[in-house]
């Protein structure tokens, strides 16, 4: 596998192999081996409710814990210890022979903010806005502004195209085409759905 350079990223975009929409400021967003992505304006945060735990087997459970916030003007404030979901402002589409990784920008990390908890890997064939799993591990609240550059995407070539890329009918591609922050769809995992646990 090889990481795409800035010149390769530009070529892939020009040839329609990678979609990044909108890419409003390519000169600022395209870095030597990545593309800076911005945060969208919709956030999902946990409500405080009285339940002992989140149960992945209860399909109504997970959504009931989340509250949606739309931010048009001004910041979304994330407090120490809080967790929120958001998406990138940009819609991303990958071909069947390219994977991507999302990493938080160093400037954001130095404020105590992580941009993804575990889901930094993007499968070949994915298209949609990338979910950001944001948490504040610092000691101060931090303001995040819609369309602020918060993360970067790195592209890597594969040795051959995927036989069953993300979105293939035979795959459980639960988040294909997402345009808004999506809560966990763990209830759709095979072992949960078929009561294998």
From Swiss-Prot:
Locations of Basic and acidic residues compositional bias?
A: 165-174
Q: Where is the active site?
A: 133 (proton donor/acceptor)
In this chain, the stretch annotated as Disordered covers 161-183
Q: Where is this site: Important for bifunctional activity?
A: 120-121
Biological process, per Gene Ontology: dUMP biosynthetic process; dUTP biosynthetic process; nucleobase-containing small molecule interconversion
Annotated binding of dCTP, by residue: 105-110, 123, 131-133, 152, 166, 174, 178
Q: In which pathway does it act?
A: Pyrimidine metabolism; dUMP biosynthesis; dUMP from dCTP: step 1/1
Q: Which UniProt keywords apply?
A: Hydrolase, Nucleotide metabolism, Nucleotide-binding
Q: Where are the transmembrane segments?
A: none
Give the matching InterPro entries: dCTP_deaminase, dUTPase-like_sf, dUTPase_trimeric
How is the quaternary structure described? Homotrimer.
- Annotated family: Belongs to the dCTP deaminase family.
| Record-linked NCBIfam families | dCTP_deam
Descriptive protein name: dCTP deaminase, dUMP-forming
**Which gene codes for it?**
dcd
